[in-house]
Amino acid sequence: MEFSPPLQLATLIQRYKRFLADVITPDGRELTLHCPNTGAMTGCATPGDTVWYSTSDNTKRKYPHTWELTQSQSGAFICVNTLWANRLTKEAILNESISELSGYSSLKSEVKYGAERSRIDFMLQADSRPDCYIEVKSVTLAENEQGYFPDAVTERGQKHLRELMSVAAEGQRAVIFFAVLHSAITRFSPARHIDEKYAQLLSEAQQRGVEILAYKAEISAEGMALKKSLPVTL
């Protein structure tokens, strides 16, 4: 998936109030960007990092610029806009770039399901096959090439795992899909040191038939695509 129009370059001054970030452009202008990420963004928002932002043509937006990518001072590319996780996953499924999720004839988004009335990110269907329910999570937390999720305690994420276990118990296919949007990550684990309950539920979910997939995106200032399956350790 290519960025169109092309992203613009800046240097991060600070992120604040969760949804805002101040940057300085190469020609010395200071801008305030919308930050589309509610997480802790650990390691993704260090002052002095190079950032890339998009600009909306919607004149009604208070902050028309959106923070899309960070390039850390170590050189790693990180996609901080969490909306891209679902976009890239959908593109990869439709292109059959994810072998485990190929062979379906229908893809639906945001389908209500489960006792807790969640909305599943994607549901795949095909004749003579169980429906496949897919919950997508964006992974940007990295420590020494190890990717982790979540980067903060997530009761919502815990709820999603419970719902997926119920789906699997009903004989349908249930998948938790970790879209790794950090170029330095080479393997994935749940962040037990941050949210022990989530890590426990993920292990329980696997035991109850929920499939766990982690795929890494190739990221550049020109575009992104999910390409590579990563090993998962619980």
From Swiss-Prot:
GO molecular function, one term: DNA binding
CDD domains the UniProt entry points to: SfsA-like_bacterial
Ranges annotated as DNA-binding: 201-220
Top-rank taxon, per record: Bacteria
InterPro entries, alphabetized: SfsA (IPR005224), SfsA_C (IPR040452), SfsA_N (IPR041465)
Pfam families the record matches: SfsA, SfsA_N
Keywords assigned: DNA-binding
Entries under HAMAP family matching the protein: SfsA (MF_00095)
Matches recorded under PANTHER family: SUGAR FERMENTATION STIMULATION PROTEIN A
Function: Binds to DNA non-specifically. Could be a regulatory factor involved in maltose metabolism.
NCBIfam families linked to this entry: sfsA (TIGR00230)
Annotated family: Belongs to the SfsA family.
Name this polypeptide is given: Sugar fermentation stimulation protein A
